[in-house]
Amino acid sequence: MRRIDSCFAELRANGRKALIPFITAGDPSLEATVPVMHALVRAGADVIELGVPFSDPMADGPTIQRSSERALGRGAGLAYVLEAVHEFRREDATTPVVLMGYLNPIEIHGTRRFAEAAVAAGVDGVLLVDLPPEEAGETRAIFTEVGLALIALASPTTSEQRLDMLCSTAQGYLYYVSFAGVTGASNLLDTHAASDRLRQLRQRAGAPVVAGFGIKDAASAAAMAVDADGVVVGSALVAALADAGEVRSARERAEAFLAPLRQALDQK
């Protein structure tokens, strides 16, 4: 959690926006995950969101669903994800890593056991898509005890009552879903409507607010970042990596995809 806080504090001090790429652990290959993470950092990533493959990713669109299926087919379970973070930490002790996934694998593992293992591996935060904030108290308490941030999600359809709860309990950063839909549906992105909401959230939240869903390139990243503390790019990056046959190709594609987004954010 401290790495996330330090990262955003430094960005804020320098007037910069956070660039947060999402990749699925184990895709395009088991061997590529850690090299791609390092490549993303070289290209300008401030935080890395690492997707935990799951068999029923209900909030994800076809691109990430297929990516998750491919990763699961290679054996990329929770143990693999934690080992990948551990390996990443051998060379990178500063870039925050946030796991993004669903509650079921965590519950099977045991929440406390998972939290302790995640921190030991070098994970800084966890975003559980299907954990309602009203039911998150016990999980948050365990995570806080071990130093793990529970990242919350808000969307255009989130009620005011729930927003109050999310803003008052936000840890690490608050992830604002720019539209009510699944990941990758960029045709639904309305930057004007999202900007209004982002301005409101940043005034209310006790943590930085980042925007995701529908961001696919430098232009959409720059537009969304105007009123956010950072942006998350996922489906477009996952698609760019999908058929990278070798680790070298995956590294090169990751850097080539992300570098223009970093440049666009730094021009704002």
UniProtKB/Swiss-Prot annotation:
UniProt keyword Signal present: no
Enzyme Commission number(s) from the entry: 4.2.1.20
Domain of life of the source: Bacteria
Coiled-coil region list: none
Molecular function terms, GO-annotated: tryptophan synthase activity
Transmembrane spans: none
Catalysis: reaction(s): (1S,2R)-1-C-(indol-3-yl)glycerol 3-phosphate + L-serine = D-glyceraldehyde 3-phosphate + L-tryptophan + H2O
Pathway per the UniProt entry: Amino-acid biosynthesis; L-tryptophan biosynthesis; L-tryptophan from chorismate: step 5/5
Keyword field: Amino-acid biosynthesis, Aromatic amino acid biosynthesis, Lyase, Tryptophan biosynthesis
Entry's Gene Ontology cellular component terms: cytosol
Residues the record marks as active site: 49, 60
Entry function: The alpha subunit is responsible for the aldol cleavage of indoleglycerol phosphate to indole and glyceraldehyde 3-phosphate.
Family recorded in the similarity comment: Belongs to the TrpA family.
Alphabetical list of NCBIfam families matching this protein: trpA
Subunit field text: Tetramer of two alpha and two beta chains.
Protein name: Tryptophan synthase alpha chain
Species per Swiss-Prot/TrEMBL record: Xanthomonas euvesicatoria pv. vesicatoria (strain 85-10) (Xanthomonas campestris pv. vesicatoria)
Lineage: Bacteria, Pseudomonadati, Pseudomonadota, Gammaproteobacteria, Lysobacterales
